[in-house]
Amino acid sequence: MKSYKVNLELFDKAVHREYRIIQRFFDMGEAEEFKTRFKDIRDKIQSDTATKDELLEVAEVIKRNMN
């Protein structure tokens, strides 16, 4: 099985930016859910237990926030 490494610095920046967008334009509750979800995913990435779907979700967030 192939293991993929996520750049945690990019991940943190993208999650923070996405969180701020959700917080500003949508609902604070949704922003907190997003933050909690990605905190759990970050923990899984660090322990190499993240699923393929979670890694794809991370890739989408990073892709949306690359500038």
UniProtKB/Swiss-Prot annotation:
Pfam families: T4_RIIA1 (PF24210). It comes from the Viruses. This is Uncharacterized 8.1 kDa protein in rIIA-Gp60 intergenic region. It comes from Enterobacteria phage T4. The gene is y00A.
